[in-house]
């Protein structure tokens, strides 16, 4: 039974006797709130609503969520778009994709938090910044979605990143599809380098930080979990 209804990302903390729980909830484009609820889902007490007034006084604007299709034309992908706070729809902006392909998670924020600052700050330099999921990403989507990249950790998410950028440019005149960059850390660094090598005519710039570019030399527990065992043994083992 769903007790904390609403289209939010939530963090819950039950009491020791499980009669009550604290429900913290928000989306990337809503103010965080916290309620005390009882075990049947009734709000017992509204505890706190974050005060973002000082933030908005600086010109802050919430990011926007979007949905697009994967490169297969069927699978829905979800993402967030961050704009400059002085955004002008009559201008053309270069597009940056901040990526982390998974497979154990994705680089898409689901709730309002300070973790969004790295994307907001980049947008203030005059970019449209997006994050989005890709097939082979978060296991919460489905077993098929999560396993899509098994055995192919380099390429599995690239086509989706390119195709979604093209869809957004078709929707929004303010996106300059001729100026697309990609960047990320760790698996995102691995992906950004692969992206500019596979699609050099599309991705004009890539920034790679701490990329695991050769997974045969990376943490074996991670590589073998998501790629499979790459070692070959002879009759002597």
Where are these regions (language model features)?
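Surface loop/turn motifs at the tips and blade-to-blade linkers of beta-strand repeat domains
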Residues: 3-7
């Amino acid at each position: 039974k769903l007790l904390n209804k609403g289209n939010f990302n939530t963090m819950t903390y039950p009491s020791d006797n499980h009669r009550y729980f604290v429900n913290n909830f928000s989306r990337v484009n809503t103010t965080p709130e916290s309620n005390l609820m009882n075990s049947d889902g009734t709000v017992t007490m509204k505890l706190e609503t974050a005060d973002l007034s000082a933030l908005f006084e600086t010109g802050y604007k919430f990011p926007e969520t979007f949905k697009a299709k994967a490169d297969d034309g069927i699978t829905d992908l979800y993402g967030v778009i961050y704009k400059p706070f002085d955004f002008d729809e009559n201008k053309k902006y270069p597009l940056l994709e901040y990526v982390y392909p998974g497979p154990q998670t994705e680089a898409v924020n689901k709730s309002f938090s300070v973790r969004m600052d790295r994307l907001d700050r980049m947008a203030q330099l005059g970019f449209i910044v997006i994050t989005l999921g890709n097939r082979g990403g978060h296991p919460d989507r489905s077993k098929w979605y999560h396993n899509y990249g098994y055995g192919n950790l380099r390429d599995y998410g690239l086509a989706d990143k390119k195709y979604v950028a093209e869809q957004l440019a078709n929707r929004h005149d303010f996106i300059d599809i001729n100026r697309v960059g990609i960047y990320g850390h760790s698996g995102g660094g691995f992906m950004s380098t692969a992206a500019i090598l596979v699609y050099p005519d599309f991705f004009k710039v890539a920034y790679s930080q701490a990329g695991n570019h050769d997974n045969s030399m990376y943490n074996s527990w991670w590589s073998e979990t998501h790629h499979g065992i790459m070692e070959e043994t002879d009759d002597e083992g």
